[in-house]
């Protein structure tokens, strides 16, 4: 089985390769002393060229001490790699009960299908291309070997939208004439499978994916539905779904430029009041959502010790591909970058704000781990290195923003006991 060296090596980890490299050296004769070190050349460019050896090893692209990259050349490869990372399906470890298959040209269905990633359904998302299943997807599907369960009502493959499924799997089709209709049908399907109504519903733009992408990670984390609205109106399937989900708390992700107050007023005419989250900057929009919480809704990531996922806002289907990383492992929200080379200032500030720290013992500290989605043409190795540095555990000093109080600069003496006052016979004190 071949699923793409870059994608799978990044997803499955590098430990096995390192082990074999070390093991192979055991029987080798002792090497000759190395030749004199070459002359050091200082490069004046911002980025130094990577040595050939580093390129062959795959580091630091595949992983650094605080990051792991899913290095797929496109969203199809990213989805296959993430699915196999979350469900290794080897060594006696079972695969998922079901898988969702989504058209690679339909980012809206991918975001909406993320609610099926959440337990107990736990269906990772794979991508197809209309009437043809890509070899990466077919190989991943074979390795995952979904077997159905009571939680999926025996379904092994959820066919989302207009895609041709591979043969031999128990399939349930979710179809519709528009992204809004498909999203509403996915909402109904999850309710049927879990026999529960959602407590919360997340409304996103069906036309501006850079604001909608973070919804996929929350849907995977919570199982709550994602429904689509237009800028100034609400599609009929969304209205019908909101009426069915009567009583749920409603949240809208994105600025008024993506979802206007007029559209939200139309929602409120048939359902509950809507709370808006987000910002006109897509990077800050995702950060605001990662920080947000209201009751049981929201990530509330405002301190160190968490997983995070970073994708490019130019690759909306990577949000769906990466969704299983938000429903297992270190359960992280999706953040986005609009620059492939440099960490955006808003993202840099957020990572510094939740940067982990320690007072005296780093082994007792909490850590942040960050998944990078896409190959280095999507997100550069330089940006990955910057993220790794921002996530690094650091000794706590005053003003580090790690939410850990630094130790006092000098040992504090206990307060001296005040001298006792002479007592009168009646037990009172003298004036």
List each model region and its residues:
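Extracellular glycan-binding segments that recognize GlcNAc-based cell-wall polysaccharides
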Residues: 3-8, 15-22, 30-431
């Amino acid at each position: 089985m071949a699923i793409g060296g870059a994608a799978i090596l990044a997803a499955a980890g590098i430990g096995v390769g390192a082990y074999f490299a070390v093991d192979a050296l055991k029987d080798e004769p002792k090497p000759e002393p190395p030749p004199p070190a070459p002359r050091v050349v200082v490069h004046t460019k911002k980025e130094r060229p990577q040595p050939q050896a580093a390129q062959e090893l795959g580091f630091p692209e595949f992983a650094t001490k605080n990051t792991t990259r899913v290095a797929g050349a496109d969203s199809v490869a990213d989805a296959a790699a993430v699915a196999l990372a979350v469900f290794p399906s080897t060594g006696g470890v079972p695969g998922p009960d079901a898988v969702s298959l989504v058209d690679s040209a339909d980012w809206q269905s991918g975001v909406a299908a993320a609610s099926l990633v959440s337990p107990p359904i736990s269906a990772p998302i794979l991508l197809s291309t209309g009437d043809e299943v890509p070899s990466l997807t077919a190989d991943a599907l074979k390795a995952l070997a979904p077997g159905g369960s009571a939680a999926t009502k025996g379904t092994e493959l959820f066919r989302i939208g207009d895609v041709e499924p591979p043969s031999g799997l128990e399939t349930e089709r979710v179809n519709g004439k528009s992204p809004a209709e498909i999203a509403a049908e996915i909402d109904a399907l999850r309710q049927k499978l879990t026999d529960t109504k959602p407590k919360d519903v997340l409304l996103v733009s069906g036309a501006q994916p850079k604001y909608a992408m973070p919804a996929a990670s929350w849907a995977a984390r919570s199982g709550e539905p994602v429904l689509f609205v237009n800028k100034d109106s609400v599609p009929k399937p969304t209205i019908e779904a909101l009426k069915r989900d009567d009583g749920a708390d409603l949240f809208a992700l994105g600025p008024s430029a993506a979802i206007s107050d007029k559209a939200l007023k139309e929602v409120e005419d048939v359902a509950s009041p809507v709370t808006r989250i987000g910002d006109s900057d897509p990077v800050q929009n995702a950060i605001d959502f990662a920080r947000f919480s209201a009751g049981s809704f929201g990530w509330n990531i405002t301190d160190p010790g968490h997983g995070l996922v970073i994708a490019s806002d130019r690759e909306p289907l990577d949000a769906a591909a990466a969704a299983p990383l938000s429903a297992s492992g270190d359960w992280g929200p999706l953040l986005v970058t609009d620059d492939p080379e440099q960490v955006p200032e808003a993202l840099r500030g957020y990572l510094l704000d939740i940067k982990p720290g320690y007072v005296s013992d780093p082994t007792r500290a909490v850590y942040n781990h960050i998944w990078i989605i896409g190959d280095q043409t999507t997100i550069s190795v330089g940006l990955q290195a910057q993220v790794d540095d921002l996530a690094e555990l650091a000794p706590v000093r005053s003003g580090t923003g790690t939410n850990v109080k630094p130790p006092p600069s000098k040992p504090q003496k206990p307060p001296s006991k005040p001298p006792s006052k002479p007592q009168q016979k009646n037990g009172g004190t003298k004036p």
